From Swiss-Prot:
Its EC number is 4.2.3.4. Catalyzes the conversion of 3-deoxy-D-arabino-heptulosonate 7-phosphate (DAHP) to dehydroquinate (DHQ). It comes from the Bacteria. It comes from Bradyrhizobium diazoefficiens (strain JCM 10833 / BCRC 13528 / IAM 13628 / NBRC 14792 / USDA 110). This is 3-dehydroquinate synthase. Its main location: cytoplasm. Its cofactor is NAD(+); Co(2+); Zn(2+). It catalyses: 7-phospho-2-dehydro-3-deoxy-D-arabino-heptonate = 3-dehydroquinate + phosphate.
Length: 382
C-alpha cells in the first residue's frame, strides 16, 4: 500500500449548475476526506467503488478505509486498465456488478480512476435504474482537469470514440494531487496536454505561465495544484454556461477532432494515449488555422514548441507504427473524422485559433482543404 500522504489545504471549485451544482475539491491528501464528505452529502448511503487493476493496487484500500471510517458500506468492482474496458462488454460487466451489489437509486457509484473508469462508471450510473448519482475520484492528471468535470460519460464504439454515452453530472469530485505521484512520466505528460489546452483556447496569460512553470508542475507542489485548479475553474465556468454543448462548450474539443481520429486509427491502444492524441490534434489545429490565415505561423509554432518542451508528441510521425494501415492515409483519417459527434450534414466542425488564448468554433468546414492539409502533414519526413 502507498505510504501516507502529506496534506495541503484544499481548494474548492464550484460547478454552478443550480440545484445540481457540485464541488471539485483539489489538494494533496484530500482522498482521506472522501468518507466524511460522502456522509455529509448522503446520510445512510451505500456505495460501490469502480476502479481498474492498476489504480486498485495503490488507492482502493485508502478509499475503502475512508468510507469505512465514516460508516459507509461499500463494494468493489475492478476492471481491466485502459480503453479495452470502455466497451459494450465493459459496460455490461460494471452494470451487472452494480445490480448484483444491490446499488439502489439513492446510493452512490464512486469512480476511482482515470478517464476510462470515470466515463465507464459514470455511464453505468446514468443508466442503472434510470439514474444513480456518482462521485468522481480522478487518479490521472487528464481526469482531474478534464474528464471528471462536466458530466460527459460514455463508451467507445468500434466505429469511433465516445459515440455512446450520456450527460450525467457527478455530485462531487475529489481531486487528490498526491495520487498523481504514482503515474508514469508518459501518463502525466499525456494529461498535461489537457492543461495546456485551457491556455491555448481561452487564457493566454495562463499559457504564458505554463511556458515558464511546466517543469514545476511535473515535480508537484503548489505549481501542480495551481495548474489543476486553474484548469478546473476554466472548465467549470464553461460547463456552467453551456452544460449540453450547444455552443461554447464545444471549444473544449480543441485538438479532439484530429485526436479522436488518430486514437481510432491506432485501435484505442497504448500506441497513442488520449492526451497524446490531443497534443498532436492541437498542433494540427493551430497549423491548420495558420494555413487558413487565421493566426500567424509564429503562433502555431509557439503552441507546438511548448508541447514539445512538455514531452508530448506533436507530429503524425511521432506515433508508434506511423506507417501502419490507416495512420498514413489521409482518406482513412477523413473517414474516421466523419464519425465525429460534431459533424453536421457531412461537414466537419473544428475548433480553430484566432490567437493563442482565443479559440473559435468553425462550422461547416469543407472536407477538401482538410484532406489536402493532412496529405501535406503526412508527407513530412519522420
Amino acid at each position: 500500500m502507498t505510504a501516507p500522504l502529506k496534506h495541503s489545504d484544499p481548494v474548492n471549485v464550484d460547478v454552478a449548475l443550480g440545484d445540481r451544482a457540485y464541488d471539485i475539491v483539489i489538494g494533496r491528501g484530500v482522498l482521506a476526506s472522501l468518507g466524511e464528505r460522502v456522509a455529509a452529502l448522503r446520510p445512510g448511503v451505500r456505495t460501490a467503488v469502480v476502479t481498474d487493476r492498476t489504480v486498485a493496487k495503490h488507492w482502493l484500500e485508502p478509499t475503502e478505509a475512508s468510507l469505512a471510517a465514516a460508516g459507509i458500506p461499500t463494494s468493489r468492482i475492478v476492471v481491466e486498465e485502459g480503453e479495452i474496458s470502455k466497451t459494450y462488454a465493459g459496460l455490461e460487466k460494471v452494470s451487472e456488478a452494480l445490480i448484483a451489489a444491490k446499488i439502489e437509486r439513492n446510493d452512490l457509484v464512486i469512480a476511482l480512476g482515470g478517464g476510462v473508469v470515470g466515463d465507464l462508471a459514470g455511464f453505468a450510473a446514468a443508466i442503472l435504474r434510470r439514474g444513480v448519482d456518482f462521485v468522481q475520484v480522478p487518479t490521472s492528471l487528464l481526469a482531474q482537469v478534464d474528464s471528471s468535470v462536466g458530466g460527459k460519460t460514455g463508451i467507445n464504439s468500434p466505429q469511433g470514440k465516445n459515440l455512446l454515452g450520456a450527460f450525467h453530472q457527478p455530485v462531487l469530485v475529489i481531486a487528490d494531487t498526491a495520487v498523481l505521484d504514482t503515474l508514469s512520466p508518459r501518463q502525466f505528460h499525456a494529461g498535461y496536454a489537457e492543461v495546456a489546452k485551457y491556455g491555448v483556447l481561452g487564457d493566454e496569460a495562463f499559457f504564458t505561465w505554463l511556458e515558464k512553470n511546466h517543469s514545476d508542475i511535473f515535480k508537484g507542489g503548489s505549481a501542480r495544484e495551481h495548474a489543476i485548479a486553474t484548469s478546473c475553474r476554466a472548465k467549470a465556468g464553461i460547463v456552467s454556461r453551456d452544460e449540453r454543448e450547444t455552443g461554447e462548450r464545444a471549444l473544449l474539443n480543441l485538438g479532439h477532432t484530429f485526436g479522436h481520429a488518430l486514437e481510432a486509427a491506432t485501435g484505442f491502444s497504448d500506441r497513442l494515449f488520449h492526451g497524446e492524441g490531443v497534443a498532436i490534434g492541437m498542433t494540427l489545429a493551430a497549423q491548420f488555422s495558420a494555413k487558413l490565415g487565421m493566426i500567424g505561423e509564429a503562433d502555431a509554432a509557439r503552441v507546438e514548441r511548448h508541447l514539445i518542451e512538455a514531452g508530448l508528441p506533436t507530429r503524425l510521425q511521432d506515433i508508434a507504427g506511423f506507417s501502419q494501415e490507416g495512420l498514413a492515409d489521409a482518406d482513412a483519417l477523413m473517414a474516421l473524422m466523419a464519425q465525429d459527434k460534431k459533424v453536421k450534414r457531412g461537414k466537419l466542425t473544428f475548433i480553430l485559433l484566432e490567437a493563442v488564448g482565443r479559440a473559435v468554433i468553425a462550422k461547416d468546414v469543407e472536407p477538401a482543404p482538410v484532406r489536402d492539409f493532412l496529405k501535406e502533414k503526412l508527407a513530412q519526413k519522420a
